[in-house]
Amino acid sequence: MLSSSDLCHDAPSDVSDAERGFHHQTLFYAGEAGFLRGTLAFIAEAISAEEPVLVAVGSMRVAPLRDSLGVDAERVSFADMPVLGRNPARLIPAWRQFLDEHEGRPVRGVSESIWPGRSAAELTECERHESLMNLAFDGGRTWRLLCLYDLDGLDEQAISAAGRSHPFIAHNGGYRRSETYLGEGDAPGPFEGALPPPASSPTEVSFSGADLTPLRVRVREWAAGGLLDGERAERLVLAVNELATNSVRHGGGGGLLLMWREGETLMCEVRDLGQIEEPLVGLRRPSPDRPSGRGLWLVNQVCDLVQIRSARTGSAVRIHLRSV
């Protein structure tokens, strides 16, 4: 099993006054004692500096943290990460909103978006979004994010990936620089690679601009057969419609929809001949002066997981929606 010492080398123990912008570091911890030791010190620094701090972890971590903080817990905001970050594409917008709520002030965050029990697909997307955090926030406002990794519950692949996506690693009460960090220009593109093939034979439906209405009907009927309730079925219809509309507008006038089921999860994938080049597409809240990305923003809000792969030969967007 890798440890933090395998991934880092000496650096200053704390952020100098000259350092500005986004400080993205990981904390490898073992057991509840390790979790509390690392997070309490980080939060105490924020409270001492009167910096707003948001802790986004699982509910099982919140209770011991609150108990250890005592009265200082009232000075900390908490979010349930399995709800907030079920789809990791919601995390960058959530942190951006936290920054906006405290405009002009340094802030801190504690995040555990990668936890034991995440599916392989979820872990892959979490790792991609951890890298995108650097692109989204580097060179911007001053804030620090401490990302937690459970050495007892995560495999070596997840631990290694953390070193590639985080420039700093918490160590001995300070931090070290990650020797394996891949900065801009070195990290793989956010949409590189291929999705694994469907786990079962999918239903395939070709579509063009004239087919969007019957396509919605087809998806609604299929979702009902997949045991989605009315509200979740409509979420799936909305997501597929947004993706298909994007294919019509930007992907060559049409595309191919694949639908299948994996356990309790309904899967839909839209393929077309377009290429997605904006790495943060769908990760910014739409505004009247920035209408682009609205479709993928909506898809990210209503789906449990969204996977995007794109190259010159075309794009594929796969969405997951659990039936329970």
Q: Language-model segments: what does each one mean?
A:
Residues T213-N241, R290:
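Conserved short strand/loop->alpha-helix "switch" segment adjacent to the catalytic nucleotide/phosphoryl-transfer site
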Residues M1-P202, S206, V217, G225, ...:
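Non-catalytic regulatory/interaction regions at protein termini and inter-domain linkers
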Residues S206-L212:
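A short beta-loop-alpha structural element at the N-terminal edge
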Residues G193-P196, P202, T245-V324:
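Conserved beta-strand-loop-beta-strand hairpin that lines the nucleotide-binding pocket
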Residues A44, V240-A244:
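Amphipathic alpha-helical segments that form the core helices of the histone-fold
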Residues L27, V237, A316-R318:
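Short aromatic/hydrophobic contact patches that present stacked aromatics
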Residues V57-M60, V240, R261, D272:
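Short glycine-rich, polar/acidic loop-and-turn segments at beta strand-coil junctions
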